[in-house]
């Protein structure tokens, strides 16, 4: 970088009224100055960013409860809870065929740390104390190994297919995640099929959204750009190019904290292939009217799919029963951030999505942000919110999908969704609830196959033994005790 381009970067920030960033610039060493300029150079148009943030603050103060929401049309939805075995078999075979032909990749969101779990380690390293003591990463890696094997058997192929696993980390989790995989020999996967990349960051601002905060005299405060930053990260890190060069057509994306996730689920992939969807999402049935979850719905005003937050629907609509079945809520499709994308669709849409706030607006979160006090030059940790962090939401692009190209598959929560979010002691989503749900699912599979578990105990079906309850005929008539691993 030349001195001239350094000056251009400084000027671009000063023109955006960010003079405060350079308050200590002249006192820095040449190396520190260079480091600072390198960091600032990642922000392409400071003036545009500031104006966008100010707009986002105004937008966050408007209310969306006036919009009209309803269920998605039947043609766009299905439920594994009441589908015929023939349809499930057909979708499974379509999915296995795509996997067997090397057309499926998996995209994992693994940027989070286990802060609420009392750990600074990446969440995927967490051990929920199963009898096998396996981490979330290991369980998921072994699901990939198992589904590769099942696809090979289905196609009667001599060669095992490869599912590429793209893992999005964040600055704080990248090194620890890679080290964990190396230490564990990639859990039996080939190191070449595991590709790590980082999500982006965005600057942190004061509460008015017009000044970027300094973390030190030569660095600004930054935070991860939210799960909606995935799309830009796919482009910026060459992942989209890699998918295309490998002939990958279908992507299954999920979050690391779901201990029951069916990684590269052939039913879900087959559902999307059969119906020619560009984008599809898995949902579980909302527990009750007051469960604080986002919902997949149809915006009646523009006839587009979208996600609405719990706070965006009226109490009356939240409690409304389905006219077709009064035992169910009318709006019940709880978002679990588990999506299918066609690569062709991503190629077409990612450049649009990442170039406009129309598709991926900034959402504002007021936070306590440790930063530099410009009055005395000292670093401080505030006790009250002193600034805002920006994030983008992955589902904000849903309305850009043609309704007939958007799918929504309801699955059984007990089989497919148990997230790890809180430390033990909380009501839900703890290591204990995750462990219990995992073992209850395993035990159900064993009993369905004629196995006997003594004294109502719970057993663990190893993730390499069975992907989704198949292949367990050998347990018929056998007795197992609490804590056994099968």
Swiss-Prot record:
It is found in: Cytoplasm. Substrate binds at residues 227, 421. It catalyses: N-acetyl-alpha-D-glucosamine 1-phosphate + UTP + H(+) = UDP-N-acetyl-alpha-D-glucosamine + diphosphate. The keyword Signal does not apply. Its EC number is 2.7.7.23. Transmembrane segments: none annotated. GO terms for cellular component: cytoplasm. Pathway: Nucleotide-sugar biosynthesis; UDP-N-acetyl-alpha-D-glucosamine biosynthesis; UDP-N-acetyl-alpha-D-glucosamine from N-acetyl-alpha-D-glucosamine 1-phosphate: step 1/1. It comes from the Eukaryota. A motif (Substrate binding) lies at residues 109-112, 309-310. GO terms for molecular function: UDP-N-acetylglucosamine diphosphorylase activity. GO terms for biological process: UDP-N-acetylglucosamine biosynthetic process. PANTHER family: LD24639P (PTHR11952:SF2), UDP- GLUCOSE PYROPHOSPHORYLASE (PTHR11952). This is UDP-N-acetylglucosamine pyrophosphorylase. The gene is UAP1.
């Amino acid at each position: 970088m030349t001195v001239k381009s350094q000056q251009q970067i400084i000027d671009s920030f000063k023109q955006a009224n960010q003079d405060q960033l350079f308050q200590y610039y002249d006192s820095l060493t040449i190396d520190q100055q260079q480091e600072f300029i390198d960091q600032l150079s990642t922000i392409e148009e400071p003036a545009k960013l500031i104006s966008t943030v100010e707009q986002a603050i105004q937008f966050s103060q408007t209310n969306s409860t006036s919009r009209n929401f309803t269920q998605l049309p039947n043609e766009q939805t299905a439920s594994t809870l009441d589908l015929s075995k023939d349809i499930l078999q057909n979708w499974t075979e379509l999915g296995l065929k795509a996997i067997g032909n090397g057309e499926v990749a998996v995209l994992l969101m693994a940027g989070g740390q286990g802060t609420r779990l009392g750990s600074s380690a990446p969440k995927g390293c967490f051990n929920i104390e199963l009898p096998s003591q396996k981490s979330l990463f290991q369980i998921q890696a072994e699901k990939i190994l198992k589904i590769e094997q099942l696809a090979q058997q289905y196609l009667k192929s001599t060669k095992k297919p490869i599912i590429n696993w793209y893992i999005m980390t964040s600055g704080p989790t990248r090194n620890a995640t890679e080290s964990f995989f190396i230490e564990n020999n990639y859990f039996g996967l080939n190191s070449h099929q595991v590709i790590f990349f980082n999500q982006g960051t965005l600057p942190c601002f004061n509460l008015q959204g017009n000044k970027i905060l300094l973390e030190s005299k030569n660095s600004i405060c930054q935070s991860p750009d939210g799960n909606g930053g995935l799309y830009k990260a796919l482009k910026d890190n060459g992942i989209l190019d890699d998918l295309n060069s490998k002939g990958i057509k279908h992507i299954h994306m999920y979050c690391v904290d779901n201990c029951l996730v069916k990684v590269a689920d052939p039913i879900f992939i087959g559902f999307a292939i059969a119906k020619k969807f560009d984008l599809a999402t898995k949902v579980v049935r909302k527990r009750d009217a007051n469960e604080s979850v986002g919902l997949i719905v149809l915006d009646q005003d523009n006839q587009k799919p979208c996600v609405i937050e719990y706070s965006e629907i009226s109490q009356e609509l939240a409690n409304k029963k389905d006219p077709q079945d009064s035992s169910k809520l009318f709006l019940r499709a709880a978002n679990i951030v588990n999506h299918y994308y066609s690569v062709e669709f991503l190629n077409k849409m990612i450049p649009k999505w990442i170039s406009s706030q129309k598709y991926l607006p900034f959402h504002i979160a007021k936070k306590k942000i440790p930063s530099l006090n410009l009055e005395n030059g000292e670093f401080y940790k505030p006790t009250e919110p002193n600034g805002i962090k920006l994030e983008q939401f992955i589902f904000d692009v849903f309305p850009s999908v043609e309704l007939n190209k958007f799918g929504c598959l309801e699955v059984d929560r007990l089989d497919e969704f148990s997230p790890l979010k809180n430390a033990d002691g909380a009501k839900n989503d703890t290591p204990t609830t995750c462990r219990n749900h995992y073992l209850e699912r395993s035990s159900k599979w064993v009993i369905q196959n004629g196995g006997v578990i003594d004294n109502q105990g719970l057993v663990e079906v190893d993730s390499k033994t069975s992907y989704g309850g198949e292949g367990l005929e050998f347990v018929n008539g056998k007795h197992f005790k609490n804590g056994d691993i099968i």
